[in-house]
Amino acid sequence: MINLMYLVFIAMMAMNDTSSEVLSGFELVEKSLRESAATAADRNRKTLEELEAANRVNPTKVGEWYKKGVEVKKQSDELFEYIQQLKLRIIRQADGKDANVDQLQHKEDLDAASEIMLSPMGSEAAKLKKRLEAYRAAMSRMVDDPEKRAMLERAIDTKVPGKSGLNLRSWETALFENMPMASAVTILTKYQNDIRYVEGEALASIARSVDVGDYRVNKIVAQVVPKSQIVMSGTPYEAAIVLSAIDST
């Protein structure tokens, strides 16, 4: 539903509809995207905690996969925070250094996004595209299932919006040139939401590789459990023999 709303507003922007209603709509979509990303981040954190717990129990089996999970989170958090800083710079460019990210004042500002993202001194949009593509490639390597890998790669999309061959603009200019501040911020938040989705898919794939959440055993061991820790001379020794199921990998 969120992505559908986003596409509708993007289509309206393509028709140069920058009415206050449309820009306010972008704010609503942006808020929903932020909430969705926060929910996904919490879910991803729990998955990594499960990997960490499994690693404590069986570091030989899980250790390598847990390290991959930590790396997934590290790369995801770094890119998420990089985009967050870009959003703050755009908002402050439009609303001033004391801008409130939850209460955008100059939503219709057409210069802020271009000045930050398309500066001739160093295009942040070009840097962002490279980082998104590098992240997409790194996360794809973490996923074994071909279908899920394809979904993951589609989630981080850096193709130029519009039909192939009909749009002569670059990805950078298509997304940020003369784009109202509210729209640019929403676009960046969408990528943050996509990052949390991709992070979740990568972590889930890693968790499946080590059967996190399953209790699997491959060995039965007999153990003697004495009824008393103290045995007096001449008294009978009593103990129970129990069978324990363990994972010896």
Question: What is the predicted function of each stretch?
Answer:
Residues 1-13, 17-19:
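N-terminal positive-inside, membrane-proximal cytosolic segments immediately preceding the first
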Residues 4, 23-24, 185, 206-214:
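Ser/Thr/Pro- and often Gln-rich low-complexity regulatory segments
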Residues 9, 186, 190, 236:
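Charged, alpha-helix-enriched surfaces in structured cytosolic catalytic cores
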Residues 200-243:
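Coiled-coil termination/hinge junctions
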Residues 244-248:
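Short solvent-exposed strand-capping/beta-turn motif centered on an Asx-Ser/Thr pair
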